[in-house]
Amino acid sequence: MKNALFLLTWLLLSGCKPTPKPIEYGADVCAFCQMTIVDRQHGAEVVTKKGRVYKFDAIECMVNYVAQQGSESFALFLTNDYMQPGALTDATAATYLISRGVPSPMGAFLSGFGNEPDARTVQTAKGGDLFSWSALQDMRQKKGFL
């Protein structure tokens, strides 16, 4: 009886831990624009403090969604690393490039990078401007969209 109670308690507690889930490209649908997520370089994901996962086909969709919902309820913010297609990286620590030379699914020309040197390499080749997570939030707040 004690073992069953322990197991049930463990399952309940572990089930609520905010954990990312892999994006299923070609199957998952964007929580913001409802498009099917297919681009492995520009996808994104947020996880609520209760463990619910929302996936996005573009970083700009995630930024707009978070702005509409309020960031307080989210535990994790993740973005695809442009240099490692399909790999998710911490969106709050990522470096972002807005460059007309690198189109993104929703037309904001926004790409995320797991580290600044990679972002600078692509910036040198394609042009554009670099931003931090907080700078993207500020830009979205000033414009009303991204």
Locate predicted features.
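Sec-dependent signal peptide recognition
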Residues: 2-7
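C-terminal motif of bacterial Sec signal peptides marking the signal peptidase cleavage site
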Residues: 12-15
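Bacterial signal peptide processing site
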Residues: 17-19
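Short metal-coordination and nucleic-acid-contact micro-motifs, chiefly zinc-binding Cys/His arrays
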Residues: 26
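Post-signal-peptide N-terminal segment of Sec-exported extracytoplasmic proteins
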Residues: 31-71
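Mid-chain, structured segments of secreted extracytoplasmic proteins
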Residues: 61-101
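A short, exposed loop/beta-hairpin motif centered on an aromatic-Gly-Thr core
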Residues: 108-111
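C-terminal partner/receptor-binding element of secreted or periplasmic proteins
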Residues: 114-146
